[in-house]
Amino acid sequence: MAEIPDETIQQFMALTNVSHNIAVQYLSEFGDLNEALNSYYASQTDDQKDRREEAHWNRQQEKALKQEAFSTNSSNKAINTEHVGGLCPKPGSSQGSNEYLKRKGSTSPEPTKGSSRSGSGNNSRFMSFSDMVRGQADDDDEDQPRNTFAGGETSGLEVTDPSDPNSLLKDLLEKARRGGQMGAENGFRDDEDHEMGANRFTGRGFRLGSTIDAADEVVEDNTSQSQRRPEKVTREITFWKEGFQVADGPLYRYDDPANSFYLSELNQGRAPLKLLDVQFGQEVEVNVYKKLDESYKAPTRKLGGFSGQGQRLGSPIPGESSPAEVPKNETPAAQEQPMPDNEPKQGDTSIQIRYANGKREVLHCNSTDTVKFLYEHVTSNANTDPSRNFTLNYAFPIKPISNDETTLKDADLLNSVVVQRWA
């Protein structure tokens, strides 16, 4: 038999809270940690089922003993009544006969009333011991699971009632209810303990010497932050009609066999790391919301700010994305350069040209220059393929400018804005 690593044994003991011998026994039998854990959890579930069956059998035995004792008492009472009713006075005693007649006359109506009252049942103001036993038996019958049978002539199938009170889900909710009540009663004590633990001293100190000449030694705190226990977190689990949900996460359906492991872990007081998104050894507080009579409702999407990419408005061609923005610390060469004051301005008018690549330029020219001159200037300064066709357009309203010998004044382009667009 291969030797089992100590790390595996310690991990099994931490997950199951068992002794070292039991951990070694399971790991030696199965060899793998996961298989050993599954076998241990299955045995624990079987033990719980056996204990429930034993408790149910004990209740049935107690009920049978009570019914037997009640029937014995009833028969004894009937015998005593017949014996008392059979008593008669001596023939020679008048006093005894008178007392007998008086007793008979005073007590004869009462048994009639009592018999009618006990026969009706609903009109009785008192409950007998038999009524109590009968009511308890009815309650026990209601608590028992109802199983039905289905099938044909040669085959049969036993179907268990899904509303079994001993089911895993009901057991889990009942434990959560009891745990919530205990937490409410002991809540203040836990808060005080937490505050006392938070005020503990941490840091470094001085070690006192044993001799007179011994120097003081500084002792550092070697406890790393990674080895300390993670902070306590809170998780919310909602149980719907179809399944259960952790916070606003996805729905874990009851009919999925993979999710039964999570229910079993929660029922045994352990927190599934993947389900609750916690670390190993981290303390977690689980708040349970019971909504078994409601269907699952998907969480509404939270409204937030805009995120993503967009298109720059006013691009030369609809649908064409604008070039990437230039960092602020860099000045592109294509940007418009302010003209120095000492440079003389040429021409009697100016036209602002907006190129398709985002560059802007202010062209000083004469009003007698032609539109064709403007096209040639844009072609030579566009820094693109000269063979690519384009058009010059008015800024507003947007309409193309004809490339002809019309003067800038006649084309109404004096002190205007011209936009370049690719053809």
UniProtKB/Swiss-Prot annotation:
Covalent cross-link (Glycyl lysine isopeptide (Lys-Gly) (interchain with G-Cter in ubiquitin)), residues: K241
Skewed-composition ranges (Polar residues): 69-79
Record's subcellular location: Nucleus; Cytoplasm
Record-level GO BP terms: ascospore formation; autophagosome assembly; ERAD pathway; glycogen metabolic process; Golgi organization; membrane fusion; nuclear membrane reassembly; piecemeal microautophagy of the nucleus
Residue span, SEP domain: 232-297
UniProt keyword annotations, A-Z: Cytoplasm, Isopeptide bond, Nucleus, Phosphoprotein, Ubl conjugation, Ubl conjugation pathway
InterPro entries referenced in this protein's UniProt entry, alphabetically: NSFL1C_SEP_dom_sf (IPR036241), SEP_domain (IPR012989), Ubiquitin-like_domsf (IPR029071), UBX_dom (IPR001012)
GO cellular component, one term: nucleus
Domain UBX: 344-421
GO molecular-function terms, A-Z: K48-linked polyubiquitin modification-dependent protein binding; protein phosphatase regulator activity; ubiquitin binding
Coarse class of the protein's main subcellular location: nucleus
Chain intervals for the UniProt region annotation (Disordered): 44-167, 299-348
Feature: compositional bias, Basic and acidic residues: 46-66
Residues bearing PTM Phosphothreonine: T331
PANTHER family: NSFL1 COFACTOR P47, UBX DOMAIN CONTAINING PROTEIN
Other remarks on this protein: Present with 3200 molecules/cell in log phase SD medium.
Protein task: Involved in CDC48-dependent protein degradation through the ubiquitin/proteasome pathway. Direct or indirect positive regulator of GLC7 activity.
Protein name: UBX domain-containing protein 1
Species for this entry: Saccharomyces cerevisiae (strain ATCC 204508 / S288c)
Record gene name: SHP1
